[in-house]
């Protein structure tokens, strides 16, 4: 299993899709190689970028195999992107679209292409989910995808007896890594696109044992009272800090959820909390490295990583080469600088705290926003909270935004914080809003804290605080 075509061809997995069809992974490998031959006839050449804006379906997997077989590069395009966002990504990568209807008719009549792509070839481009600037273009070679699939399968304890649901979008590392790990372990794979009702029904019907997703996804399943009792391990990404109780709620429903860590540059499922640990431990993002060849260090609070899952570099404008200068700025002596604040637990285990840019610097101390948000979420009627810091003449001051359908008594909220937090952590304002500004990504919806800071600055300027 040295490259992506072999990952499919040598897997014992059977893959079930939303339309009811079931295909072996080997069938998908054959069909993908036929699709590669058809794409060659359409003028695609080794190194060309293909824009893939597809749901989780068989076509998506065939085209991923086709890219690997022919040496094309798959550019993952979020299905929720607007036309302007698609045009920007396609322009920056020089990616070409695929005429899918013609391809469905054409590839069936083609002889499978003898794969020419190698494990060292560029394979897939993910976009980072930055909330303050244009997304960076993260390039992975086949090598990092396949090697990490094997490591993640081992780290999650997957085997051919397991049933894995692949529900996160394949256009992001969370979805693709969950899929490839299942292929590496020859699991039965249930491919679907998330809907709180139908996904819950499918988990019960297929007796899914493993599924990875965002905290919001599991929250919505639990709200629907989905039967999750078959889930022995669900890795969850912590994108919504207001859902701190998600692990305990899932346990009450018979499912084991556990925190993990990953990002596009090192892929999802880079580390995992012990599923046998208690709910408090499993609720903490981070965990133990899944690869024996991976390592981490913490420098001035920043998490830095090495390992076989590491990306090849950030793609340059135009898509043909790696931007060496941009890539080098994110490395320190061979260690990838994540931009995340973390704390060491042992040589193989760490706890993710926050994005360094999101950490509040208050009263001369670093404060994780979640520390204040947790107190605010104790208030009856407060569904969620986000806290940012605003620079004032007397120093940085915290400002809180809450989602409270029936409103919130700001004075009471501030007094509550004063009883439980040091004075410098107490928000100077607690503002109720209808929803947090956010940006979608293939890995989960992320709150735009930069916009919250602008809103906070405007609120303080208006109030004179």
Question: What are these language model-derived features?
Answer:
Residues 13-43, 51, 55-57, 61, ...:
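Conserved AMP-binding/adenylate-forming core of the ANL superfamily
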Residues 146-163, 170-210, 265:
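Conserved AMP-binding/adenylation subdomain of ANL enzymes
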Residues 288-292, 300-329, 367:
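Conserved ATP/PPi-binding loop(s) of AMP-dependent carboxylate-activating enzymes
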Residues 211, 307, 341-425:
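AMP-binding/adenylate-forming catalytic core of the ANL superfamily
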Residues 103-122:
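Flexible, low-complexity linker/hinge segments
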Residues 209-213, 222-281, 295:
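Gly/Ser/Thr-rich phosphate-binding loop
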Residues 24-26, 123-147:
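Conserved AMP-binding A3 loop
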Residues 360, 386-391, 399-401, 418-465:
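Conserved C-terminal "lid"/linker of ANL adenylate-forming enzymes
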